[in-house]
């Protein structure tokens, strides 16, 4: 019998894992639980091959989404902002101007690509 080892991942962490795997297909490098200068922690930040910065917030439930009051603070720290949710999440609750990623623990798919809002160059340093 094989003994289970390691940490149990939360539902949000499993979504983040699928998102990171998908971003790799775009040649993006991902960091989990990154803290920009604001001091607030983002779930996933993706760094693209041309210097693009994407932030992805992973929401595992409606309650998780509704209790997130910090997400708008992230908009000025990225070129594109996304929500990542599972296939059962009621996507009509999400702001339409944000990007949408449907994810699972193994992969993800970008459903809606948000308009690019180029990050101020002084913030890229």
Describe the function of each predicted region.
Residues 1-35, 93-125:
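Non-catalytic C-terminal interaction segments of nucleic acid-processing enzymes
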Residues 23-25, 48-49, 75-77:
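Flexible, charged surface loops at secondary-structure boundaries
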């Amino acid at each position: 019998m094989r003994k289970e080892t390691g940490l149990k991942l939360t539902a949000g962490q499993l979504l983040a894992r699928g998102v990171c795997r998908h971003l790799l297909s775009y040649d993006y490098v991902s960091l989990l639980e990154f803290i920009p200068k604001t001091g607030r922690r983002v779930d996933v930040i993706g760094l693209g091959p041309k210097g693009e910065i994407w932030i992805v917030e992973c929401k595992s439930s409606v309650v998780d989404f509704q209790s997130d009051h910090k997400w708008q603070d992230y908009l000025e720290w990225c070129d594109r902002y996304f929500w990542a949710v599972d296939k059962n999440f009621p996507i009509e609750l999400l702001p339409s101007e944000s990007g949408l990623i449907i994810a699972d623990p193994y992969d993800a798919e970008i459903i809606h690509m948000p308009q690019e809002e180029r990050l101020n160059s002084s913030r890229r340093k």
